[in-house]
Amino acid sequence: MTSVITRRHFLASLPALVMAPKVMAQSGNAPIRVRALSHMTLTVSDPKRSVEFYQGLFGLPIQARQGPTSLLRIGRGPQFLALSGGGANLRPGINHFCLTVENFNVDRIVTILADHGVAKSDATGGGLSGGPMKARVRVRGAESGGAKEGTPELYVGDPDGIVVQLQDPSYCGGAGALGSVCPAPEPAPRRGLLAVRNLSHFTIGVSDPPRTIAFYQALFGLPIQAHQGASPVLGIGGGPQFLMFSGGGGGRGGANPAPPRPPRIDHVCLTMENFNPDNALKALAGYGIKPRGAATGPVGPLTSYVSMRMEDRGGAKGGTPELYFTDPDGIPIQLQDVSYCGGSGYLGNVCP
C-alpha cells in the first residue's frame, strides 16, 4: 500500500506517535468501541456487470438485497461487499465503509458523536452523512430489505466528509431492528477462481492525516499496530484488520502542478488463505485482468500489479509483496494473506 505524507504532517504527528502505547492502553475505554470491519459499498456504472465480475472471480453468494443494491457475502459473513448503481452524476468508487460497534444504539451513539463535535443532520443534501462532522440516521424500510417498521442505519462524516457507517456486530445488511436478519444466501453461479475470507483494511486519502488520526482515535480508541514509513496503521478490534490514512496530495508537480486529489477511500483489501502473489496473478490473468508490466501513469480497469513494500515503509528486508487489481470500473482492490496486519515479514503479518 502506498502512503504520501509531507514533512509538515510527519512533524505534526510525532506527539501522537509518542503517545501510541498510552492510546493502546486506553482503547478499551473508548467512547465507541469498535469490533470489526463490516462492509463497503462500491458505486459502479453497471451493477449487473459488477455482480457477475465479483461472483465469477470470488464465487461470492448474494447475502441480501437492498432494493437494486446486491450484497455479496465475504467468507462466512456477515461481512459483505455491496454493489450499487451510481447514476449519471456519481463516479465509480468506494462510496463508504462500515464499522461494527459494541452496544449499538443509535441514540446513545448520536449523543457521543455530538460530544465529539459531530452534529446530527436532519437537513437534505450533503450525501449519506450530511457532510463533514455530521451524522445522519437513515431508516431503511421493507422496500429496501429492512424491517417493516424500519432498520436504523447510522452514517458519520469524518473531518473530510469520508462516510463511515456504524452498525451492530450482527449486521448483515438485512431486515430486523439491527439489520441482522438475512435469508439463506443465493449461491453464485459457479465457484470462484480465488477464495476470499475477510476484509483486511481500507486506505483512505485525507487532507490532514494527523487531524484525521486524532479524530478516529478520540472516538474509537484505535491503537497503532504498525507503521508504514511515517504513517501509523490503526488496528481494528485487536487486529489484524486496520485503517490507514495517507496524505490527499499526489498531484503532478513542475511548472504547472496539478491540484491535490480530493479526500477519498483509495482502496479496500480482501484476504485469502495461503496467499501467493504469483498464483493470484495467474488466476487474475486467466480472468482477463492483465499485468500492468512496465506501463506508467494511471492504472486502467482490469489491470493487476504487485508493489514491494520495503523496510523504509515497514516491510520485510527483501520486500513485502502487496497485490492490487482493478475491477471493470477501475476501482482498486488489494489482496493479501489472512494474517496480514500491515506490518513486516514476507506476508506483512509481523506487527509489534
What does each of the following model-derived ranges do?
Residues 33-65, 200-209, 213, 218, ...:
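Mature N-terminal segment immediately following signal peptide/propeptide cleavage
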Residues 61-94, 101-103, 163-170, 223-265, ...:
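Conserved short beta-strand elements that form part of the metal-binding/catalytic scaffold
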Residues 59-65, 118-123, 221-227, 289-294:
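Short secondary-structure junctions
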Residues 36, 66, 148-150, 198, ...:
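Residues that act as N-cap/strand-start positions at coil-to-secondary-structure junctions
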Residues 59-64, 100, 141-147, 220-226, ...:
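Short linear motifs in intrinsically disordered
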Residues 19, 28-38, 54, 70-73:
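Hydrophobic, helix-prone linear segments
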Residues 2-30, 35-46, 70-71, 86-195, 281-282, 286-352, ...:
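Vicinal oxygen chelate
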